[in-house]
Amino acid sequence: MASRSAGTLITHNNATYIPPALMPGYRGHIPTASFTYGDTYGSTSARCFQDFRSTVLNSSRSPYCQGGQFPTGNASDPALVIGHRARGWDRFLHSPSWSRYNGDFKRAQELTQFHKAAEQHRDHYRDKSGSVHQVPHFIVPVKNPETFPLPQQVL
């Protein structure tokens, strides 16, 4: 008899049984956990998960949220709430300097400029009247002095 009519699993030790719905997702290898003789990896990780779950339930938030503090509409910290911030011109003085993504902004700006140039080139290509000017970036036969200027021409 492995299960009851209610669907709960009967184990030899019900105090350590954690229902799968309450168990957190895989959080990787636990290097801080010391494995003792006779203690399996599963029971040690289950103990670690249970400790993590109890700390989250006791504090009502994840202990891993001390990383990036991003403004939200609802937060336990009043300084993070967007409605708490200044609404006048002073809001630009304290504008955040962080970004949520690790991006190369100079490269993103170059790509934006290239996209605009490509759109202008497309407009020139579609133009039948000849009134739209060419984009110099896309003129293929480039003269040698434009690409490799002589040292006396650079001055």
From Swiss-Prot:
Pfam families: CMI2B-like. Disulfide bonds: none annotated. The keyword Protein biosynthesis does not apply. Keywords: Cell projection, Cytoplasm, Cytoskeleton. GO terms for cellular component: axonemal microtubule. It comes from the Eukaryota. It is found in: Cytoplasm, Cytoskeleton, Cilium axoneme. InterPro entries: CIMIP2C, CMI2A-C-like_dom. Belongs to the CIMIP2 family. Microtubule inner protein (MIP) part of the dynein-decorated doublet microtubules (DMTs) in cilia axoneme, which is required for motile cilia beating. This is Ciliary microtubule inner protein 2C. It comes from Xenopus tropicalis. The gene is cimip2c.
